[in-house]
């Protein structure tokens, strides 16, 4: 438990940031889940639309510090390859 006033304030701030980051991470996972569902269903149009919606959301998570840049790029690259494969 925090003892000093500054440590107590820092703990409160961390709690707030954690809640925000948890919501952002959940939002990204939701977009990824929708894309995954479209890919497994084999629905080309839905997969393309879901990918176009998911990519900016993933990259936004990078700018907000939720995901590492390389992790996001790897995810986008692999998802794009899967979408291209289903579109061909």
Curated annotation (Swiss-Prot):
The gene is rpsT. It holds the Pfam family Ribosomal_S20p. It comes from the Bacteria. InterPro entries: Ribosomal_bS20 (IPR002583), Ribosomal_bS20_sf (IPR036510). The lineage of its organism: Bacteria, Pseudomonadati, Pseudomonadota, Alphaproteobacteria, Hyphomicrobiales. NCBIfam families: S20 (TIGR00029). This is Small ribosomal subunit protein bS20. GO terms for biological process: translation. One of its GO terms (molecular function) is small ribosomal subunit rRNA binding. Binds directly to 16S ribosomal RNA.
């Amino acid at each position: 438990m925090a003892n000093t006033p500054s440590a107590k304030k820092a703990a409160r701030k961390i709690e707030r940031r954690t809640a925000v980051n948890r919501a952002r991470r959940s939002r990204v996972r939701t977009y990824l889940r929708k894309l995954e569902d479209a890919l497994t269903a084999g629905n080309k149009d839905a997969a393309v639309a879901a990918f176009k919606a998911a990519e900016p959301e993933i990259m936004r998570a990078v700018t907000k510090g939720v995901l590492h840049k390389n992790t996001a790029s790897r995810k986008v690259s692999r998802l794009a390859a899967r979408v291209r494969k289903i579109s061909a």
